[in-house]
Amino acid sequence: SIPCGESCVWIPCTITALAGCKCKSKVCYN
């Protein structure tokens, strides 16, 4: 998995989610 540079502790992945990133361990991964 590659970190997308966005956290998802309080809110879900937003901008990076459009690039296919999903929340994993409080960080958005691709």
UniProtKB/Swiss-Prot annotation:
GO terms for biological process: defense response. The keyword Disulfide bond applies. The keyword Nuclease does not apply. There is a cross-link at residues 1-30 (Cyclopeptide (Ser-Asn)). Keywords: Disulfide bond, Knottin, Plant defense. It holds the Pfam family Cyclotide. Disulfide bonds join 4-21, 8-23, 13-28. This is a cyclic peptide. The presence of a 'disulfide through disulfide knot' structurally defines this protein as a knottin. Probably participates in a plant defense mechanism. Belongs to the cyclotide family. Bracelet subfamily. This is Cycloviolacin-O7. It comes from Viola odorata.
